[in-house]
Amino acid sequence: MWGIVLLIVLLILFYLYWTNALNFNSLTESSPSLGQSSDSVELDENKQLNVKLNNGRVANLRIAHGDNKLSQVYIAEKPLSIDDIVKEGSNKVGTNSVFLGTVYDYGIKSPNAASTSSNVTMTRGAANFDIKEFKSMFIVFKGVTPTKTVEDNGMLRFEVDNMIVCLIDPNTAPLSEREVRELRKSNCTLVYTRNAAAQQVLLENNFTVINAEQTAYLKNYKSYREMN
């Protein structure tokens, strides 16, 4: 009896496989293993193939600007907890560099929701660097000395090694004309924000998106490239 049932099941499976209704590779194709990356191949406007690497949570960029200036910037491609920031900042982020992204208030508020602190800036000390929090964002200057130029409820801005680094509150009003002019006239400007209105204004003013998450924008630079 059970032998007949098993035979019928096998025949049905064979039929489904033969007609391509059953794909034994579907599980591995839709769920990459831990050793696989989520890289993608895209066709650009010039019909050339570009490989886009998405297997890391921190992008490492080298930006050329000014008179032979090179700035090293690390951008978190997803929100990180304070513990993650300390770990990435200690293990992956090199010296003489800037590290920024979105922070979670790990252990203070919910670890599953981004920070909503009303404080303009808060500084947390790590072993060999400080973590500055601005609204739901963070910035780390590792081995470089920044000069703070703007700090208000909507924007935090520094100058470091002839490059402007700016964080824009994701919940603030759209950028004013004065703010846009100030950002445009700067030498090299890196803006990090999740503010959709601000992102649109930056794109309209010819800022370039430089990370996969589309939260980092660059202007007045010579070139940039992602490092391994």
Swiss-Prot record:
GO cellular-component term (any): viral envelope
Location relative to the cell: Virion membrane; Host nucleus
Induction (UniProt): A microRNA encoded by the virus, AcMNPV-miR-1, matches the E25 gene and down-regulates its mRNA expression which presumably favors occlusion-derived virions over budded virions.
InterPro entries (UniProt xref): Baculo_ODV-E25
Main subcellular location: virion
Pfam family for this entry, one: Baculo_E25
Keywords tagged on the record: Host nucleus, Membrane, Virion
Function recorded in the entry: Plays a role in the production of infectious budded virion (BV) and occlusion-derived virion (ODV) formation.
Family: Belongs to the baculoviridae p25 family.
Identification of the protein by name: Virus envelope protein E25
Source species: Autographa californica nuclear polyhedrosis virus (AcMNPV)
